[in-house]
């Protein structure tokens, strides 16, 4: 029987060999993946044309340990890397990193100070997955509990459930010693009041009133920077989220995603962040994936699971993310006008420590800024550019 050598270990270990039959099956899978890419449309910065085999980059060797997150976790990755360097567990590392942001009252994307629902209540969601033990935990629509990533980890460790939601999750948290607190900061409360004023006749001087600007100025004490920020998030409600994933020097992988969800949402709305296989997905033999942006679009394609399966087929993290993005675009028949009403981003790592991310549009939530994500490979945290599916500005700017 003919054998084909496909990889040699740097440590001089025996080569992994494939039989002729396995090689044929692998080639067949690659052909199927290429056909799927043409069906889904879109590729690396090409404006949405169907991808070709040449558009997929070879998988580069990464570095381990590694920890990545969305860009709003940049300053927190060091805490996770410290745990990885000391030989700590990958799940402890990612939860430690996002907890820093959950605790930060000046960050309105997650945790304390997150932007509230339409009634002014902050509702949080989170999920965790632990690759080595194949376990998961999540919580959704949680009020008055700040560190929901840690709460999701507690669900995983202390129960035989995967998800607990709403008041049940709050009561579980209290029973486990979590502190209840008012999560609405003065900053977030003022933005919510401004949104109410903009969205309801009953909460503002009047739709044509010349006093509107004075009213908004009074809410923010004349702070022009805060007024401009409030006007932007009122017009384009953000989906504040941090996915974070890590691989250690042994190749073990974990991930978490934590969020305050869509600003001004209907109470009880749940996005992709706490959904295992959508906003968070880990396979310890392959890699990890997460997402930010409009969670409903990710749920419809099971984005995290899709990315993991693309990694399993041998695609790089970036190309795996672009494949998932292609499915989002396919649902709208690549109609840029419809797709232009929202943002979505995918992030991934593989077992070797390679990493990548894709954005639907070239820009982040601000049209002038390129979409990016945070990476820490052992020396210091840095930002890396997301690869856009459409090389254009979008997202209801």
Which residue ranges define each predicted feature?
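N-terminal secretory signal peptides
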Residues: 1-18
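Alpha/propeptide regions of enzymes that mature by internal proteolysis
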Residues: 16-18, 25-28, 32, 46-397
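C-terminal segment of classical bacterial N-terminal signal peptides
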Residues: 37-38
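General helical structural elements
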Residues: 11, 24-25
């Amino acid at each position: 029987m003919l054998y084909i050598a496909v990889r040699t270990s740097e440590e001089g270990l025996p080569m992994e060999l494939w039989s002729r039959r396995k090689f044929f099956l692998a080639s067949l899978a690659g052909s199927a993946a290429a056909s799927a890419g043409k069906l889904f449309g879109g590729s690396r910065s090409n404006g949405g044309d169907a991808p070709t085999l040449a558009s997929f980059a070879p998988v580069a060797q990464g570095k381990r340990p590694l920890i990545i997150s969305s860009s709003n976790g940049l300053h927190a990755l060091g805490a996770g890397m410290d745990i990885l360097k000391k030989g700590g567990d990958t799940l402890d590392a990612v939860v430690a990193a996002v907890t820093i942001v959950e605790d930060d009252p000046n960050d309105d994307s997650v945790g304390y100070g997150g932007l509230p629902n339409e009634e002014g209540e902050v509702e949080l969601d989170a999920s965790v997955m632990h690759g080595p033990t194949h376990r998961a935990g999540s919580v959704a629509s949680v009020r008055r509990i700040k560190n929901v990533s840690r709460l999701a980890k507690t669900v995983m460790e202390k129960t035989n459930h995967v998800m607990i939601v709403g008041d049940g999750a709050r009561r579980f948290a209290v029973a486990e010693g979590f502190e209840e607190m008012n999560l609405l900061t003065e900053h977030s409360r003022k933005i919510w009041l401004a949104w109410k004023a903009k969205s309801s006749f009953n909460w503002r001087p009047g739709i044509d009133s010349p006093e509107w600007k004075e009213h908004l100025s009074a809410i923010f004490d004349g702070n022009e920077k805060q007024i401009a920020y409030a006007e932007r998030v009122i017009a384009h409600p953000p989906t504040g989220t941090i996915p974070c994933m890590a691989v250690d020097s042994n190749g073990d992988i974990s991930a978490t995603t934590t969020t305050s969800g869509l600003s001004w949402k209907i109470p009880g709305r749940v996005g992709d962040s706490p959904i295992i296989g959508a906003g968070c997905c880990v396979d310890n033999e392959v890699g990890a994936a997460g997402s930010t942006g409009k969670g409903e679009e990710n749920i419809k394609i099971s984005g995290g699971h899709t990315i993991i399966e693309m990694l399993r087929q041998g695609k790089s993290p970036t190309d795996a993310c672009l494949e998932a993005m292609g499915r989002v675009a396919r649902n709208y028949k690549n109609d840029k006008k419809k797709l232009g009403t929202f943002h979505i981003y995918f992030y991934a790592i593989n077992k070797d420590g390679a990493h990548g991310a894709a954005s639907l549009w070239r820009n982040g939530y601000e049209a002038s800024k390129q979409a990016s994500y945070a990476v820490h490979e052992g020396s210091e945290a840095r930002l890396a550019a997301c690869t856009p599916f459409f090389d254009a500005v979008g997202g209801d700017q």
